[in-house]
Every structure is written in structure tokens, then in C-alpha cells.
Design a protein with these regions (language model features):
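P-loop/Walker A phosphate-binding loop and immediately adjacent motor/lid segment at beta-alpha junctions
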Residues: 85-104
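His/Asp/Glu-enriched, well-ordered alpha-helical/loop segment
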Residues: 1-81, 96-99
Length: 104
């Protein structure tokens, strides 16, 4: 709802983690009390999206990793928990899976 990042998920996750643009503005971030943890940001881009799309209650739900769920996911080169927020957008996608099949 505001122009702080592109539509790329990793860009949005970085903003959620820092409340700053990719240039580090503003210092301290917008509303720093709204900074999300990595787990909260990943949930916002996965399980929360599925819930908004009413796909979390289907016979084969998506948006989370659990038995019976649709395996749509990306495998990143590094764990987002292990990098600084400003490094998240540069994480390379090692593989993409749709319905459990590698598609890259």
C-alpha cells in the first residue's frame, strides 16, 4: 500500500524486517515498532496469503510445508534467518518447485 519496494517477495520481506527502503531510508525505519521477525515475514508471504485466498482449507492446501499440502516453494541459497534484512533481496533462488516438481 505504499511504494517502498518492488513486487518481488524478497524485497517485501526485507522491508518487513527493517521498515526501510533498499537504500536504508529512513534511519530507524518507518514505524519501527511494526518490524516483523523473519518467521512473521515468511508467514505473511506464505500461509497468510493462502488464508486470504481461502486455499488453506482445501483438500490439498498451499502456503505451508506439511504432509498433504501442495509443495509450491523456493529453495534459497541461504537461510533468511542468517542474513541482515538488507541482504534478503539478493538471496539467490536455487530451485523452484510447483506441486512438488522442480521447475527451473
Amino acid at each position: 500500500d505504499w511504494p517502498v519496494s518492488s513486487g518481488a517477495p524478497l524485497d517485501g520481506i526485507a522491508v518487513a524486517l527493517s521498515r526501510q527502503t533498499s537504500d536504508g531510508e529512513p534511519p530507524g525505519g518507518w514505524t519501527p515498532d511494526e518490524v516483523l521477525s523473519v518467521d512473521q515475514a515468511l508467514t505473511a508471504y506464505t500461509a497468510a496469503v493462502a488464508e486470504q485466498a481461502f486455499a488453506d482449507h482445501e483438500a490439498a492446501p498451499w502456503g505451508r510445508l506439511e504432509p498433504g499440502a501442495v509443495a509450491d516453494l523456493v529453495w534459497l541459497e541461504r537461510d533468511p534467518h542468517s542474513v541482515a534484512p538488507q541482504e534478503v533481496p539478493a538471496l539467490r533462488v536455487r530451485a523452484t518447485y510447483l506441486a512438488g516438481r522442480r521447475v527451473d
